[in-house]
Amino acid sequence: MDQDEKVTEALWASKSANAQLSYYLSHQLGFPTYRNTEVEYFPVGEDKFASMIKELEKAEKFIFMEYFIVEEGIMWDTILEILKRKVNEGVEVRFMYDGMCAFDLLPYSYPKKLQKFGIKCKMSNKIRPFVSTIQNNRDHRKICVIDGQTGYVGCLLYTSDAADDR
């Protein structure tokens, strides 16, 4: 990703510390600084979920999701119905989740089920039947990227407990 030099110039004109941080992010990590972006904080998971559902419905090109814990139930089933519909509309959908879910939340063959719907699915860090330090290296990410324009990070797991569906 290329850094927009006009953004860099504006940062140098405003505050050198910001420009230096931008330089580091761009040159050392490959993350350019942008202008005219928005961030919204969701103090309650239900608010994030409602917003994300609206944005998923708008997807036109791709939806990429990576989540730590997923369980079939109200929240995940709502998302899955949208993902299946979006695949049928020609949207590329990719989903990755942590293999710990296969322990008691999802069947081990769940990626194959999603692939039958046209969703590209991977299970990371599959459970191994022997003791290993790898099992402690879980993927706790909670990321959703829609069309490269909208993103959601953190906060919500897609389980019945998260939906307070007990």
What are these regions (language model features)?
Residues 1-160:
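N-terminal localization/anchoring segments of enzymes in phospholipid and broader phosphate metabolism
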Residues 161-166:
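A short, hydrophobic C-terminal helix/tail in secreted or cell-surface proteins
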